[in-house]
C-alpha cells in the first residue's frame, strides 16, 4: 500500500520491473475484481491501462494513485464496462488523450449476453495492430487479439518483455467468448499469436501476473 493513501483504496505494487506503478481496485473484489486499473510509467509521466468503470469510489482511488504525476495517455484493451467507462471522466480530469482499441461496432440484432458494453467510449486515437505509443525509455505496442471481443487488443511493453493481456488471457480463469461479438475462432487464432511471441510475463486485467505465459497459453 502506498504511503499516505488509505489502504481501503486497494492500492498495491505489482510490477516495478515492467514500469508498472500500481493496480487500483476501488471497491470490493480484490485482485480478481472488476474495479481495476493499471498505471505504468516513470519520470516522464504514466499511462493508465483499462481505467475501469465510471464509479465514483473507483475514480477517486485512481486519481489518488496518480497523484501529481502527468498522465500521458489513457488506454483500453476493450470496451466492456469494467474496463473503459472511466476513460472519459479521467481524461476530463487529467487532459490526457484516450488512445487504444476501437469502439465496439455491433452488426447483429441477436440478443446479447454481454450487452453491458461501453457505448460511450470515444477514443482520440485508435491503435492498429503493431502501432505504438512511447515515452522516455518505453514503448507500448498494440497487439490485436480479437476473440473475447472483436475490438480487443493487448499491450506489449517492449523494453521489459511484459504483455498486458486485458481479458484475452486471465490468470485465474479462461476468458469468456460470447457471440455475436465474441468469436471462438478469432480467440484461438489470437492465442496462437500470443504463443508465437516471446513475452516474458503477462499482466492480465483480472488475477495475478502470469510468470510462465507460453506454458499457460499452450494449456488453453
Where are these regions (language model features)?
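Metallo-beta-lactamase
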Residues: 45-48, 53-55, 112-122, 132, ...
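Conserved beta-strand hairpin/beta-sheet module of binuclear metal-dependent hydrolase folds
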Residues: 22-70, 154-166
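Active-site HxH/HxHxD metal-binding segment of metal-dependent hydrolases
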Residues: 45-46, 53-139, 161, 171, ...
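Short amphipathic, helix-prone segments within low-complexity/disordered or flexible regions
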Residues: 4, 10, 26-29
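Short, intrinsically disordered, charge-balanced linker/junction segments flanking boundaries
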Residues: 33-35, 39, 213-220
Amino acid at each position: 500500500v502506498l504511503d499516505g493513501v488509505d489502504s481501503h483504496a486497494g492500492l498495491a505494487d505489482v510490477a516495478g520491473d515492467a514500469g508498472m506503478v500500481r493496480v487500483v481496485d476501488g471497491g470490493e473484489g480484490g485482485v480478481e475484481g472488476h474495479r481495476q486499473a493499471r498505471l505504468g510509467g516513470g519520470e516522464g509521466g504514466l499511462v493508465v491501462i483499462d481505467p475501469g468503470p465510471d464509479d465514483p469510489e473507483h475514480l477517486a482511488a485512481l486519481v489518488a494513485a496518480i497523484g501529481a504525476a502527468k498522465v500521458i495517455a489513457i488506454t483500453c484493451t476493450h470496451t466492456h464496462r469494467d474496463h473503459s467507462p472511466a476513460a472519459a471522466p479521467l481524461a476530463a480530469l487529467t487532459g490526457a488523450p484516450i488512445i487504444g482499441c476501437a469502439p465496439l461496432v455491433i452488426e447483429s440484432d441477436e440478443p446479447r449476453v454481454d450487452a453491458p458494453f461501453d457505448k460511450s467510449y470515444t477514443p482520440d486515437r485508435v491503435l492498429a495492430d503493431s502501432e505504438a505509443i512511447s515515452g522516455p525509455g518505453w514503448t507500448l505496442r498494440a497487439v490485436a487479439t480479437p476473440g473475447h471481443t472483436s475490438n480487443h487488443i493487448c499491450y506489449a511493453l517492449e523494453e521489459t518483455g511484459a504483455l498486458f493481456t486485458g481479458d484475452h488471457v486471465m490468470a485465474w480463469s479462461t476468458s469468456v467468448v460470447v457471440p455475436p461479438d465474441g468469436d471462438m475462432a478469432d480467440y484461438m487464432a489470437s492465442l496462437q499469436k500470443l504463443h508465437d511471441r516471446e513475452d516474458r510475463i503477462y499482466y492480465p486485467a483480472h488475477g495475478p501476473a502470469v510468470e510462465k505465459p507460453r506454458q499457460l497459453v499452450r494449456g488453453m
